[in-house]
A protein has these predicted regions:
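Bacterial N-terminal signal peptides that target proteins for export
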Residues: 1-7
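Bacterial N-terminal signal peptides
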Residues: 7-16
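Boundary at the C-terminal end of the N-terminal hydrophobic targeting segment
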Residues: 20-25
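N-terminal beta-rich core of secreted/periplasmic extracellular enzymes
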Residues: 46-88
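Metallocarboxypeptidase
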Residues: 56, 68-69, 132-134, 140, ...
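Short helix-loop-beta-strand segments that form the rim/entrance of peptidase-like active sites
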Residues: 101-147
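Acidic carboxylate motifs that coordinate Ca2+ or other divalent cations, activating on Asp/Glu
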Residues: 163-167, 181, 226-230
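C-terminal beta-sandwich/jelly-roll accessory domains of carbohydrate-active enzymes
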Residues: 489-584
Length: 584
């Protein structure tokens, strides 16, 4: 296997001569480079080897080109089976070019495992919860993006051959690295009737001509030639099936939304991942890492789905606004309202199928490359400040980004224009933004990005349900009758079942079961001071409920009998707890 270039993943085991002493393990993941797919695989295997008691590593699907989708589960079996605990799911690299999510996922795993037993907060989370992490969803895409020449925006698709130009051939005319520099840059040609002229303030850039101005350049698109002789250049590249438009909830065909594929889950790796996730019934929250905009997005993904229940919105608002504080510059937003409409995306699938809460993080913030001094920056809260933070705004101008490239990374992000003889266009120039630019921060910025995003996950994880079960009272009423009162409480923000899942009846509510004696009556204790109880008519020994976030629910049972009485609480997202009391 290819060794881990750059960080050289090492597993150093110091075996003590004392047989009772445990070995210590060090895995120095440095996070000062973007790791190739093979390096991600090797890191996962090394983490599993170093922490076998806390991790499970499995292949959950296979890509179109035969590469495994690997998932790591972090769970302490000494504190209970994984499925009996609230589950946090994290994935990254849904689109092939959006590689930061893979590195965030690795950092999260390394942080959880490396700090277990050292940091009380981390130890408590690993003992209480279960973490499911899929660092790379689009494994073919990550491999080809880092290994092959690309633009910053290319190689997003699943590797499903698609005939984009309807000529009977698939993927036959993709961009090409004409000057063999490892990048797919832009082509331009001198043209007095062109739509662009040289930027008078920065000759490496171009600006659109205004009415009445003479043109100087025509942009010809990305590097490439007419491979199939149809008179078009680069008209049929890889795919295009968008892995975040191919999920099975609210999917729409390509004439509604490009890139959706011929049918839901036509991506074989996605289908395998979805089937695996469906079996993880304890997944209560999902973070999915994408890469452009500096945003924490929640659904709905389109207006027609309607707003989420207000109780769920309150959960999203509380956690999302804290996320803005953990990751300065990020904005908490609603997908359809603040960005754009999507169909068949993974977030709505997780929300409406798994019944989980969901955030999509767009991790690269364009303002991080805004080359401005303090006095040049817009005042916080002004329209100018908002524009700088808007990925669709030109306020973070190409001029600023070029100055950032020149001054902060010594010109690595932009290729100067160079002459080239094109077989069709003749004398042209090739240049512009390189592959590892525009939506990928330079390597020195990686550590801060992955740490802050992982900490946002951990803050959310702290607010997964933490249910406490108390027997408040066992009171003899005379004869063999007893009154038993219980309380289920949750000091965290996330309830044991989302209100959307309740509304859609996605799965059974939590259950409180009483056994060991005859339950004469039972129900929700509405007011313990006035003895008001909402009794359940049928089968009072079985109560269906949801424990709210930052709240409680109390029950009262009238039971008949002597001896032991067992009360069992069971929840998909709240865990399992049993209590036994004596009736005497």
């Amino acid at each position: 296997m290819k060794k881990l270039a750059g960080f050289a993943l090492l597993v150093i085991l110091f075996a003590s001569t004392l047989p009772a002493q445990k070995a210590e393990t060090t895995i120095p993941l440095r996070f000062d480079q973007y790791y190739t797919l093979d390096q991600v695989y090797e890191a996962l295997r090394a983490l599993h080897k170093a922490y076998p008691q806390l991790t499970t590593l499995e292949t959950v699907g296979t890509s179109e080109e035969g590469r495994p989708l690997m998932a790591m589960t972090v769970n302490n079996p000494k504190t209970g089976p994984a499925l009996d605990k609230p589950g946090m799911y994290v994935d990254g690299n849904m689109h092939g070019n959006e590689i930061q999510g893979g590195d965030i996922s690795l950092y999260l795993l390394d942080y959880l495992l490396g700090n277990y037993g050292k940091n009380p907060e981390v130890t408590g989370l690993v003992d209480r919860l279960c973490f499911y992490v899929v660092p790379v969803v689009n494994v073919d895409g990550r491999h080809h993006f880092l290994s092959d020449p690309n633009t910053p925006d290319s190689n997003r698709s699943l590797r499903i051959p698609t005939d984009d130009d309807r000529d009977g051939l698939a993927d036959e005319d993709a961009p090409e690295d004409l000057d063999a520099d490892g990048n797919i840059c832009a082509m331009r040609k001198k043209d007095p009737f062109g739509r662009y002229r040289t930027d008078p303030e920065e000759p490496r850039l171009m600006v659109p001509v205004k009415p009445g101005e003479k043109g100087e350049w025509s942009l010809l698109g990305d590097e490439g030639v007419d491979n199939d002789g149809d008179g078009q250049v680069n008209e049929d590249g890889e795919g295009y099936v968008d892995p975040n438009r191919n999920w099975g909830f609210d999917w729409a065909p390509p004439y509604v939304q490009g890139g959706s594929g011929e049918y839901p889950f036509s991506g074989v790796g996605l289908k395998g991942l979805a089937e695996w996730a469906m079996a993880k019934t304890n997944i209560a929250f999902v973070w999915s890492y994408h890469n452009n905009g500096g945003m924490i997005l929640r659904g709905p993904s389109r207006k027609g789905l309607g707003e989420y229940p207000q109780q769920d919105v309150a959960v999203y608002d509380y956690l999302g606004k804290q996320g803005e504080r953990i990751i300065p510059g990020y904005r908490y937003m609603i997908s359809w309202k603040d960005l754009y409409t999507t169909y068949g995306d993974s977030g709505e699938w997780a929300t409406q199928t798994l019944g989980a809460y969901f955030y999509c993080a767009e991790v690269f913030a364009p303002e991080s490359e805004a080359f401005k001094g303090v006095s040049e920056r817009p005042e916080p809260g002004t329209r100018g400040e908002e524009a700088v933070r808007d990925i669709f705004s030109s306020e973070v101008s190409e001029r600023e980004r070029l100055k950032f490239s020149d001054s902060v990374v010594q010109g690595e992000l932009y290729k100067p224009w160079k002459a080239f003889k094109h077989p069709v266009y003749g004398d042209i120039e090739i240049g512009g933004w390189v592959k590892m630019s525009s939506r990928l921060g330079p390597p020195f910025m990686i550590k801060d990005l992955v740490h802050r995003n992982a900490m946002a996950v951990l803050f959310t994880a702290k607010h997964l349900p933490e249910v406490a079960f108390e027997v408040l009272e066992v009171k003899a009423l005379g004869g063999d009758l007893f009154r038993v009162r219980t309380r289920l409480s949750n000091p965290r923000a996330v309830p044991t079942m989302s209100y959307l899942a309740q509304k859609a009846n996605l799965y059974p509510k939590d259950m409180l079961k009483v056994s060991g004696a005859k339950v004469v009556a039972g129900g929700v204790l509405v007011d313990p001071f006035l003895d008001r109880v909402s009794f359940k008519k049928d089968r009072p020994e079985l109560q269906f409920l949801v424990v709210p976030g930052f709240g409680k629910i109390e029950h009262e049972f009238i039971v008949e009998g002597k001896g032991g009485l067992t009360l069992r609480y069971e929840s998909r997202h709240g865990g399992k707890i049993a209590k036994t009391v004596k009736l005497d």
